[in-house]
Structures are given as C-alpha cells and as structure tokens.
A protein has these predicted regions:
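Periplasmic polypeptide-binding modules associated with outer-membrane biogenesis and secretion
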Residues: 1-46, 69-97, 101-106, 132, ...
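Edge/loop elements at the starts and ends of beta-strands within beta-rich repeat scaffolds
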Residues: 3, 34, 48, 80-81, ...
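Repeated loop/turn-to-beta-strand initiation elements of outer-membrane beta-barrel proteins
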Residues: 7-10, 37-39, 50, 61-68, ...
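C-terminal outer-membrane beta-barrel translocator/porin domains of Gram-negative envelope proteins
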Residues: 18-27, 37-50, 56-58, 154-156, ...
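Outer-membrane beta-barrel "beta-signal"
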Residues: 57, 186, 344-354, 374-377
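Transmembrane beta-barrel wall of Gram-negative outer-membrane proteins
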Residues: 93-177
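Active/binding-pocket-proximal capping segment
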Residues: 121, 321-330, 338-342, 364-365
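Class II aminoacyl-tRNA synthetase catalytic cores and aaRS-like
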Residues: 127, 365-374
C-alpha cells in the first residue's frame, strides 16, 4: 500500500478471534490518505543538462473516466480522481534541454494484475556541436510477479532529427542527421528488494532489458541489451539510529545484429561516470572538415561499468557525505580496453520540501584515463 504513493501512513491490526470461525482472523487496515495531486513550478540545475525550468501537473489518483458534471466540480478538483491511475504533464524549458510531454498509467488495468500505460512528447537537446530533436511515443503493458518481480512489454515509436551542426561534428554523427524513424519492441524484467523503499540502505534492484529495433518497421534494425544492478549494505548504525551504507552498482550494455545510429549508442561521463565530462567516455569520430576536432564522442556498442559508494551521516538525517569510485569503459566490441577509473567525494542534502531525492554535489578525479579524455571535476 505504501508503494502506491497514495497514503502517508498504513496501520494494520489483527482483530480478536471470532468464536464462530476460530481459524480465521479479520485484519483492520487504517490508512491516512496523502495529497495525490500537485502543480509544481521549479528550477533545476545539473552538470549534464544545464539550467531547466519545470512546470508540471501530476495526479497519482487519476480517473480518466470521471468527467466533471460542471465547471465548479472541475475547479474544485472533484473530477478525474479516484481510480488510482497516474497522470502527469510536464513543460520543461532550458538552456540545453527543452521537453514537454504527457503520460498516463493504470497500475491495475481493469482491476487486474496488469498495468497499461503510454506517453507522448517532444524533446530538444543541445550538445556541444549539434542539436537533437526527438518526437517520442510509447505504449507499455506490465505485470507484477509476487512482491519483488515486475515484467514489461513496450512498443516505442520515435522520430529523431539532428540539426545545427558546427565544423567539429564528425562524419558519423553528420550521416545520422535524418529525420529517422526509430521503432522498437522491448521486454524488461526488474527485481526490487530495497528497504526502506524511499531511502534504501539494504536490499537490491536488478533491471534487465532487450529491445529489438526495426519492429514493426524503421530506418535501423539492431538489438540492444542492458543489465544494471544496484545493491545496498548497511555497514553500521550509530546511537541515533543513522545508517552507514555501502552502495554497489554495475551496468552492462551491448548492441548487436545490425548498425545502430550514434544517438542510440552507449556513452559514459558526467553523472554516469564522475570525474569525466558528459558523454566523453566513448569511441571518437572522424573529423568531417579539415581542422575539425578529432576527439568528439560518437558512442560505442559495448558498455561496462562498476561503481562503489559509501555514505555516512554528518548532521542528523539531513546532511551526509559520500566517497566513491567509478570505473568502466565504452568501446565497439566486448572488451575491457580503454578502462577508466575515478575516485572522489561528495555531499548529500536531504530536504523533504524538495522531494525524496537529495541534492547531490560530487567531486570526481580521474586516476586511470586516456590521453583524449576530457576531465570534469
């Protein structure tokens, strides 16, 4: 019930034995319903995406069939609520990223164990040497298996165009300018045992996916596989019941069975590999013009990553420090060539008014790198 996000508190009490049926006990469930709808205005800043404004409307207890009977019912927020569906709309203008989209998901479609969801939107992303514009849509069907396993089948249809090239754009990216139709059919499986669910210190999360591109049609045909794991270990607890936790991460991705465009390949760097510039860990392209930059990343078909992070409290439950080590590579074929390693430290600020995710400030320093790598502390 807590994982639905619809309740602040859930209390379960086993009722006294009934003499008429001594082998059965009733269970009293008391819930404190949370505020499920929100209209948010915000400003986000990140090392990978620049400055982004955010205007979002969300409802975690949406009902697409509950149409208002009057305008007053609509403005009093008594319509479109009550079925447990999840609806959101976002408008995100930024200096590097511009996105607007909408999504609707029914986690228990027709009161079954299956979920049904869809999303549509448009996004523009400015890279150093070009711009990528994506018109995207996705439909997915999912199902829970027990308490920890979840499977999903999804169909995606995207229209991608690369524009605003400068002289440093390599041949490989320029040839992918499109517009390109990118369709895919994907299957994903996840297993989650994180505890507690919102700020885990124990348990693990495993995600596995395989996507076949070119289904039912499209400009590219290839297969993309990906596996990621995250594990938490509670190392110690102090007298204030604060936890010292170790986090281990791994990622393996492989593209095969055809030629993939540069915008679907793997990259590491920035938040995904601290101490290196965003998307800088990757094979480099061929300069398109004389004097062009020979060190522009074009992505690889093989990604391997291992990371470790130790987090310990500093001030109550609101401020903590981390030390970390990131390692991995992105190349064209499965191997450990051009392997990089970085170490660093950071701070986490947990501010409940800003959501469950902390403000993160990390400082990474490469200790194993290639000559052409671009560092970013």
């Amino acid at each position: 019930l807590m994982k639905t996000g619809l309740f602040n508190k859930v209390t379960m009490t086993i009722q006294p034995e009934n003499s008429d049926n001594p082998n059965v006990r009733d269970l009293l469930v008391e819930v404190d319903e949370s505020q499920t709808g929100s209209l948010n205005f915000g400003l986000m800043a990140g090392s990978d995406s620049g400055l982004i404004g955010n205007i979002s409307l969300s409802q975690r207890n949406f009902d697409v069939a509950d149409w208002p009977e009057s305008w007053s019912e609509f403005w009093q927020r008594k319509a479109f609520v009550g079925a447990g569906q999840q609806f959101s709309m976002e408008f995100q203008p930024g200096d590097e990223v511009f996105n607007y989209g909408a999504s609707l998901t029914d986690p228990r479609f027709l009161d079954s164990d299956y979920s049904l969801g869809g999303s549509v939107g448009w996004m523009s992303r400015d890279y150093n040497d070009y711009r990528q514009e994506t018109l995207y849509s996705k439909v997915s069907v999912g199902r829970k298996f027990g308490d920890i396993w979840y499977g999903r089948l999804s169909l995606s249809a995207d229209r991608i165009k690369l524009t605003h090239f400068d002289d440093n754009v390599p041949v490989e990216i320029f040839n992918d300018q499109g517009p390109s139709t990118i369709n895919s059919l994907g299957i994903s499986v996840s297993r989650t045992t994180l505890a507690p669910y919102t700020r885990p210190t124990e348990g693990s999360r495993i995600n596995m996916s395989i996507d076949q591109y070119g289904v039912p049609s499209g400009d590219y045909t290839f297969t993309k596989t990906y596996i990621s794991t995250t594990s938490y270990f509670a190392i110690d607890r102090d007298f204030l019941h604060r936890t010292y936790a170790l986090r281990l991460d791994s990622k393996i991705g492989y593209i095969f069975g055809g030629e993939s465009p540069t915008f679907e390949k793997f990259y590491l760097g920035g938040r995904s590999f601290r101490g290196f510039d965003y998307r800088s860990i990757s094979p480099k392209g061929t300069p398109r013009v004389a004097g062009g930059d020979p060190d522009v990343s074009i992505g690889g078909d093989w990604e391997f990553y291992l990371g470790a992070q130790y987090e310990f409290p500093v001030l109550d439950k609101f401020i903590s420090m981390v030390v970390f080590c990131d390692s991995g590579t992105v190349v064209d074929k499965p191997s450990f060539d051009e392997y990089r390693v970085s170490v660093g430290t950071g701070i986490r600020l947990y501010i409940p008014q800003l959501g469950q995710a902390p403000l993160a400030f990390d400082f990474g320093f490469p200790i194993v790198k290639e000559e052409t790598d671009k560092k970013k502390i």
